[in-house]
Amino acid sequence: MKILFVSYEVYPLAKVGGLADVAGSLPKYLEKEGVSVQIAMPFHKKVKADNIENTGIVITTKHLPEKYSFEIYKTPLPGSGVPVFLFKNDQLIDSDEVYEGTDLALQAIAFSDAVVKFAETLEPDLLHVNDWQPALIPAYISAFYNGKPKTLLTIHNLGYQGEFDKSYFYKTGLPEKLWQEGKAVKNGAFNFLKTGIVTATAISTVSPTYAKEIQTPEYGAGLDETLRALSDRLFGILNGIDYSEYNPATDKRIPVNFDINSLEKKKENKIALQKELGLPVIDVPVIGLISRLVEQKGFDLIEAAAEKILSNDLQFVVLGTGEERYERLFKSLGERFPEKVSANITFNVDLAQKIYAGSDMFLMPSRYEPCGLGQMFAMRYGTIPVVRFTGGLRDTVKEFNPETLEGNGFGFEEYNPDKLLEAVEKAIKIYENKTLWNQLMLNAMNTDCSWDKSAREYIKLYKHVLNSGRDILNA
């Protein structure tokens, strides 16, 4: 089985969000299971790799009215034999940042068409494309290649759809009937993600719960009707995390290594974190939060409940950047409660690891969360998630029961600041019982969040897709 995996970001070459972690991990685990995998991504200016070679191949777009050419570079995905093909066009890919540029829509259109042209040479059985930027790939294959090879479109976050002016549709060279039949349009705009959804052989998203949620008006972001109509080819598979990369026993980014048999050393990471961030070194629960500071993540709940949460004996460590409103919120809390709050309005991978290893709890009160990786990283390091039960958080975090000693975290259902406060205070109460807390840490660290299981699920889905004989464009 040959898979061409297409993503705009791949860790460690270029990372903005969780998609990079998925794209940098899943192909390695597929390779371990015997799948032949290759990756295609734009050659962003921020791409970092030790050995990048120019293949000498130049791919010119095939279907766009205006032609664009990409030089193809190649580098191995670190820790694997998976080749990454980098598509270089400095005219289109003209920003230092992954999701910035003079014309993101045209960049995504040209990249998608170039990948399809390149696939003629690679001859994969299936193209696995991720999010809206390469979502036109299924449309090109459906329109011009009789639906072969097959395509799987994975939606990592339905909130980002790639909506642009209708004029961009005519830059794609795609058949007019896609527009006339409403397959490429939402609210009068050209919608990249919808175009991919209706033309892909199959669609997946990053947790079973989110696959159900996006078929409802509450979570469907205006595409719930489309997704309900296609529910027979919509699947949910949980993301995993790379256990070789995120391993408290070997992680060089944390002060003291530990494992499930030396949990007492976790406390040394907590003390080191308190010292580094200028917090008093005292035995109170440290709650970590690492996130993009955006509305989706539930920070309006924290804003409403902050005073009551901080009236408890605890410390709160924040790391992330995002909307100015929330950056101001956490800076203000840091200034008002300097003994309790450390607000780090930046992104620093090393500090993130220290927070995962040194915190007692990890807060994710998300409004919606397609999968979430933070709770998985946290549990790997014995840090207990406190979450809102939505999307992948519902699939991975189970409420701790002090009677049966089962469960790996704490959560709440209703999107409400009082419910958030209740969940935090429940966690604090269990923290005060060291026997129960030790059991809870063991449960968290024993939770299987590795890619092994997920990779096998994807292989099952690939086989299902390859056996599907649907002509999507004419369906």
UniProtKB/Swiss-Prot annotation:
Pfam families from the UniProt entry: Glyco_transf_5, Glycos_transf_1
Record-linked SUPFAM superfamilies: UDP-Glycosyltransferase/glycogen phosphorylase (SSF53756)
Enzyme Commission identifier(s): 2.4.1.21
Domain of life: Bacteria
GO molecular function: alpha-1,4-glucan glucosyltransferase (ADP-glucose donor) activity; alpha-1,4-glucan glucosyltransferase (UDP-glucose donor) activity
Keywords, in A-Z order: Glycogen biosynthesis, Glycosyltransferase, Transferase
Pathway of action: Glycan biosynthesis; glycogen biosynthesis
Catalytic EC class: transferase
Signal sequence interval, chain numbering: none
Gene Ontology biological-process annotations: glycogen biosynthetic process
Binding site for ADP-alpha-D-glucose: 15
Catalytic reaction list: [(1->4)-alpha-D-glucosyl](n) + ADP-alpha-D-glucose = [(1->4)-alpha-D-glucosyl](n+1) + ADP + H(+)
CDD domains per record: GT5_Glycogen_synthase_DULL1-like (cd03791)
Family (UniProt): Belongs to the glycosyltransferase 1 family. Bacterial/plant glycogen synthase subfamily.
Protein task: Synthesizes alpha-1,4-glucan chains using ADP-glucose.
Protein name according to UniProt: Glycogen synthase
Organism for this UniProt entry: Kosmotoga olearia (strain ATCC BAA-1733 / DSM 21960 / TBF 19.5.1)
